[in-house]
Amino acid sequence: MVLVEGAFCPAVVQSCLEHTKEYDRDQERRAERSAKGEALAMSRVSERCLRYANPTRCLSTKRTPMRFCIDRYEWPNRAGERPDFAMTWLEAEARCTSVGKRLCDVDEFTFACEGEEMRPYAYGFERDATRCNIDKPYVQPMRKATPHEACMKDASCKAELEGLDQRVSSGSMPCASPFGVMDMNGNVNEWVNRPGQREPWRSGLKGGWWGPARSRCRPTVTAHNEIYAGYEVGFRCCSSAKP
């Protein structure tokens, strides 16, 4: 595990200087439709920023001291192996507990990813698909999300999952955070714990995945409950640091 220690800023401003052309075109179309009074459905185009203003501004009057340990790699935390995927939050929590660890809290993941510099991406302020496993072509799944273990027992589910899979081996790309934690952006979306929430909504997803998603340090997806098992979903574990 990696020791993460420092001062975390709870509220920040990260100003995007340049978005993808796809996102800009989508926003223009939506603005035109809105001006005509047309109803707008949720956009299917992710807000991907190519370049952020440097430095990030901390809005909090006081930073929060943090000290904890986090796995260097996505579960099973072994360099050179592809991370597990199609996992539910409950499965992730149980596996971390089985090795004397726990799921990372939202702010722990964020700080381990961005560091005290509050980087939008683990590696800096400009999006770079050569650093992390991101921006691969999106492939539409044909069936409802199925947990990995159950999917492996169904030949058609297994075949589809293999066709969707675009993971890379842990540590195979130079996708390191300021603390040396690997693959915190992209590869697989990672389950985290949301303190103060009640089941089945203690679950959050952070870091993004291999597809055309935000794949940044700060955002947290809260739309999926604890039994969701998206094909792009994995996790890593945290633990309290010894005094």
What are these regions (language model features)?
Residues 59-61, 159, 227:
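Short secondary-structure boundary/capping segments
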Residues 80, 84, 173, 225:
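Conserved aromatic-histidine-acidic binding/catalytic patches
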Residues 1-97, 117-118, 124-127, 132-133, ...:
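Short, compositionally biased
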Residues 89-221:
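Functional-site microenvironments in short loops/helix caps that host divalent-cation chemistry
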